[in-house]
Every structure is written in structure tokens, then in C-alpha cells.
Swiss-Prot record:
Source organism phylogeny: Eukaryota, Rhodophyta, Bangiophyceae, Galdieriales, Galdieriaceae
Native source species: Galdieria sulphuraria
Subcellular location: Plastid, Chloroplast
Protein name: DNA-directed RNA polymerase subunit beta''
Keywords for the protein's UniProt record, in alphabetical order: Chloroplast, DNA-directed RNA polymerase, Nucleotidyltransferase, Plastid, Transcription, Transferase
Top-tier EC class: transferase
Subunit structure and binding partners: In plastids the minimal PEP RNA polymerase catalytic core is composed of four subunits: alpha, beta, beta', and beta''. When a (nuclear-encoded) sigma factor is associated with the core the holoenzyme is formed, which can initiate transcription.
Length: 85
């Protein structure tokens, strides 16, 4: 299973395709935080905010478009959670 994922990612890289790496196995292979667990949203928002504060800007680069959308969604969810608590 992991070997198949590695083969698919390698082939995609050679063919200049984009993979947003949303799955568990893909993120384990490349050493990123896996998109799972109850604390993932809060951790992701914290790390994303910290990174952008250091850069002092949220990038509008098209390659970071998905990250910008995720940031907005997570920010809205955290605001809703604060209102409920």
C-alpha cells in the first residue's frame, strides 16, 4: 500500500502534476502532520497563523490558494466554537 502511494507520487512529480496530499499515507511518507485527530484543526490553525505572522502577510500566491481557503474555514469554525462555549 505504501509502495503504491510512493510510485503514484513519483510518477505525478515527473509528469508535473499537483497533488494536494490530503490523505494519511501521503503525509506519513513525506513527514508532514497527518490530517487526522481531534486536535488537528486547532494545531493547523496555530501553525498556519504563526507562519504567516512571521512572514507578516498571508500569501495570495495561486500555489497557496488552498491554504488560504483552509485558513478561512478554520478561522470561522474556531469563532463559532468560541461563541458556543
Amino acid at each position: 500500500s505504501f509502495q503504491e502511494t510512493r510510485r503514484v507520487l513519483t510518477k505525478a512529480a515527473f509528469e508535473n502534476h499537483i497533488d494536494w496530499l490530503k490523505g494519511l499515507k501521503e503525509n506519513v511518507i513525506i513527514g508532514r502532520l497527518i490530517p487526522a485527530g481531534t486536535g488537528f484543526k486547532q494545531f493547523y490553525l496555530y501553525e498556519y497563523t504563526k507562519k504567516n505572522c512571521e512572514e507578516n502577510i498571508i500569501s495570495l500566491d495561486p500555489y497557496n490558494f488552498e491554504d488560504n481557503i483552509i485558513y478561512k474555514i478554520l478561522t470561522n469554525q474556531l469563532e463559532q466554537n468560541k461563541r458556543l462555549n
